[in-house]
Amino acid sequence: MRSSIHASRLRKMGQSIPASTGPMARSANRFLQNRAAIFGLVLLTPLLFAVLTYPLWLPYKPNDIDLMAMNSAPSWKHWFGADGVGRDVFARTMEGGRISLLVAVSSVVLSTAIGFLIGAISALGGRWADAIAMRSVDLAMTLPPVIFLLVLASIIGSGIWSTVVVIALLSWPVLSRMIRARLLELREREFVMASRGMGAGLGHLLFRHGLPNSIDILVVYATLQVANAILLEAGLSFLGLGVPPPAASWGNMLNAARSTAVLEQFPWQWLFPGGALVLAVLAINFIGDGLRDAFDPRAELN
């Protein structure tokens, strides 16, 4: 009664009644108020635009060779200069960004799917499923990551999709633990117990209850993991175990410029791909941190 009287008074005074907002809207508002996250978006947007659209407006292809431009410095003709065989460094930096992002996003999609399924099955599948899933997670997390990465890459071989598989197999255990912790709490709630009582199968529990209640974890994990995957791809390619030449990636461009002569005399051959790598990782981390803070349940209390 009092609320209706208060609402009528607000209407008479010409004031609007504040509309209630859901948790997703509040999370979006917190994200938009995060200056670091917005700064990350400002950094990442032009880089993504250039990486995705450069074939439409750049006259050079990544593997076009101009023998007259070998090791030439940045100029109006070659904005980032040319490498040791006359290839345009700007075109290769943009193509390297496309391949690095393709590898990163693909590996994150794969690792997110694996991590969610194993974590959800562990939480909702019963005692034996939990024991088997968690022992596999423990085994994966006890392996030294660098050694495991190098051994797996040498077994599977180099290539774009091989690199995707290698990074995904290294990245899923942390997510599976987070999903398991979230869904162990969820399975004790009445609506999940009611679904179990009505004979709902594991697939129904996973995708009807588990997935919608894990979206915040998945979004934050995937965003932060993209930056980590870009670094892993660059490291593998730098060591010759990732994307093989002549395909361009930021890692193998840095590998090609590792000689002392190039480092000292032709710094544009490593400075621009290295700068793009740092810029992309920094921007994505800012965005991921902003998403993590926006979805943090403690922010609701503050």
Swiss-Prot record:
Region of interest (Disordered), ranges: 1-22
Per UniProt, subcellular location reads as: Cell inner membrane
Q: Which keywords fit this entry according to its UniProt record? A: Cell inner membrane, Cell membrane, Membrane, Peptide transport, Protein transport, Transmembrane, Transmembrane helix, Transport
Q: Name one GO cellular component term.
A: plasma membrane
Q: Does the keyword RNA-binding apply?
A: no
Coiled-coil annotation reads none
Can you cite a GO biological process for this protein?
A: protein transport
Which positions fall inside the ABC transmembrane type-1 domain? 97-288
Pfam families cross-referenced by the UniProt entry: BPD_transp_1, OppC_N
Its placement in the membrane is given as: Multi-pass membrane protein
Chain ranges passing through the membrane: 38-58, 101-121, 147-167, 200-222, 230-250, 268-288
- Looking at the record's lineage, which domain of life comes first? Bacteria
Q: Which family does it belong to?
A: Belongs to the binding-protein-dependent transport system permease family.
- Assembly description: The complex is composed of two ATP-binding proteins (BOV_A0347 and BOV_A0348), two transmembrane proteins (BOV_A0350 and BOV_A0351) and a solute-binding protein (BOV_A0352).
According to its UniProt entry, the function of this protein is described as: Probably part of an ABC transporter complex that could be involved in peptide import. Probably responsible for the translocation of the substrate across the membrane.
Protein name (record): Putative peptide permease protein BOV_A0350
Give the species this sequence originates from.
Brucella ovis (strain ATCC 25840 / 63/290 / NCTC 10512)
